[in-house]
Structure formats: C-alpha cells, structure tokens
Amino acid sequence: MSLVYLFQSVGILTPCGSAGAIAYITSQVLPAILIGPADVALAQWKYIYSMGKKSFPFLAIANALVQGYLSYSERKRSIFSSKLYAISALSGLCIIPFTLLFMKKDINSLQTLNPDLILKDVKATQNFRSIIHRWGFKNLFRSAFMFFSGLASIAGSIYF
C-alpha cells in the first residue's frame, strides 16, 4: 500500500511541477530575455529550449509510467480512479506530439535564425520577436496539458 502512496505523490508532483515550470518559462523568463538585444535573447532562448528539451519529455514519460502503474494497481478497487490515472498519463504525454506537430516550425525557425542578421535588420528583429511570442503562446498549451494531468491524478488519488 505504501508504494501506491509514493506513486500518488510522484504522480501529482511531477505534472504539477512541470506545468508550473513551463508556465514560468513563458510568463516570466521570455519577457525578461526579450528586454535585451535580440541576438542575446536568441542565444538565451536557445539555451532555455535545450535545457527544456533534455528534461520535459522525460518528465512526461516518467509521469505516464507512474500514472500507468497507478491505473493498473487501482483497477480492481476503483475503476473510476483507474480511468483518471489513465487520463492523467495520456494528458501528460500530449506535450510530446503537441510540440512536434504544432511547435516544430517555430522551433526550427528560431534555431536557424542568424544572430548577426537580427541585429542589423529591423524586419528580422520584428520577425524574431513575433516567432518567439508565438512559441511562448503555444508553450502555454503544453503547460495546460501537464496541469490537467496533475488535476486528473489528484482526482484519482482523492476519489478512491
């Protein structure tokens, strides 16, 4: 029984923490880096993106594994809880295909931008800022997926 409690804790903290971190990047970090010159902002965005790419997909997968265990272990006691954990797993995993389907174009555009060009050309600077704002808006959807995953996990933990 104690293993279930441990997995419930991890199953709540992982998606909720990820949701908060993703939302923080969009609402606090992006505006802060956009204060400076565009070439510096681009370098900072690339660093932030590379760090997120190394962690958030794996957190989503780890969350899905934890939720999958909970869904499996709770199926005999409470089918509703089991379904909530399954919903939580799928919701958390949605950040990966969402990124690949809806954000990849913006990511590729930002990664291939020439820092020297965005410093010299006003139109290139405006284009950079437009792309990064669009990326930030889409990033909030990723936060929402993880938040919903956390809520489903909380509901599954409370329901039984």
From Swiss-Prot:
Its main location: mitochondrion. It comes from the Eukaryota. The chain crosses the membrane at residues 13-35, 55-72, 83-103, 140-160. It is a multi-pass membrane protein. Keywords: Membrane, Mitochondrion, Transmembrane, Transmembrane helix. It is found in: Mitochondrion membrane. GO terms for cellular component: mitochondrial membrane; mitochondrion. This is Uncharacterized mitochondrial membrane protein C800.14c. It comes from Schizosaccharomyces pombe (strain 972 / ATCC 24843).
